[in-house]
Amino acid sequence: HLKTYQSEDYYIHDKQFVIEGPLTYEDLKALTFDAHLTAFRDAEDQYEALLEITTLPEGRIYVARQDELIVGYVTFHYPDEIERWSTGNLPYLIELGAIEVSINFRQLHLAEKLIQLSLSTPEFEDYIVITTEYYWHWDLKNSKLDVFDYKKLM
């Protein structure tokens, strides 16, 4: 599985971020994980899940970080075996599994930058990328949006 590493410095509001990936297990392990990255599970368990994805042959983790602190990420991997779209074992079908930005770093366009960088490598031309969005992972409470307005935001 071809994985082309990319890195981009991003500046906004006098803050510098690095958007980079796909990261290896060792690269990811050398970074710290923001405690507010809890949309899917507690931060420590989510960090472990990301580390596990890096060990998959097709797994890709891209991060947004400030210094050594991961403040956002996006994951790509083959669909889970329990999902019906995995039944064909199509090597060109990859799932954007998760995207999350810490609450303290939202509205800085980091999610947009993560998507742009991660999908800009030539190898993604050979994939069909799918994603599923479940509203119970959305931050409706802190965004003060209802499901329909949050959907428009997405």
Placement of each model-derived feature along the sequence:
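Secondary-structure boundary elements
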Residues: R65-L69, S120-E125
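A conserved beta-strand-loop-helix scaffold within acyl/acetyltransferase catalytic domains
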Residues: F40-I94, I99
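Well-ordered, non-membrane alpha-helical segments in soluble/globular domains
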Residues: A43-E48, E112-L117, D146-L153
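Short amphipathic alpha-helix that is part of the acyltransferase structural core
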Residues: H1-E52, L56, I61-R65
